[in-house]
Amino acid sequence: VRSHLILNMIIDGKKEAQSLRDAIKKEIDSLKSKNNKVPGLTVILIGNFAPSQIYVKNKEKNAKEVGINSDVIRYAKDVSEQEVLKKIKELNNNEAVSGILVQLPLPPQINKEKIINAIDPTKDVDGFHPINVGNLSSGYNATVPCTPLGCLLLIKKIEPNLSGKHAVIIGRSNLNGKPMAQLLLKENCTVTITHSKTKDLKTECLKADILVVAVGVPN
């Protein structure tokens, strides 16, 4: 975020994340005391892809810290698509499971679109289901992918009022760029999305009050 008042500011993401976990823990403790219930998160992990193992381990750790019941269902990388779909249907009907997350990427024999569409939209933790994507695009309440939502929370720590700001987003992925644009539009920003085919990217970036980079590669 560019401002005549703010020249350089390092945001401590770990500190902000801890504050958010503390707030969530208080909410869950309150829910438990009133209703004797806590949210339940089930993660489906397929194969032994190292980064996915790390992501899931961190999800388990954070869920435990805030008081969420966490379960990980692990499958070998050659599991059939039908078996995973059957498990998702079972989780959709399980009242103890309030959130379902299928860790990506998936092996080639499994259709990602089918898997995402099979998840109950109200239990879609990633916000990838077409209903959640459509609701976000329409400005309605929706489950939002965690990376753009976290980015917005950090931006608003610096500048709570984003109305009228010019935001430039580098990257148009369904995971980051597109939902980030929708979130900033909801904050009444003027949003420009740039990508690998954008001409004169430097000029576009220089116009920005807010610059969000989500391309996954350096330089």
Q: Which residues fall in each region the model found?
A:
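Short, well-structured alpha-helical segments in soluble
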Residues: 83-95
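Short beta-strand elements in bilobed, periplasmic/extracellular small-molecule ligand-binding domains
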Residues: 41, 63-77, 191-193
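Conserved hydrophobic helix-helix packing surfaces used for dimerization/oligomerization
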Residues: 39-41, 167
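Intrinsic disorder/low-complexity segments
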Residues: 1-6
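Anion-binding alpha/beta catalytic cores of soluble intermediary-metabolism enzymes, centered on
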Residues: 102-162, 180, 218-219
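Glycine-rich phosphate/diphosphate-binding loop of Rossmann-like nucleotide-binding domains
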Residues: 46-60, 142-219
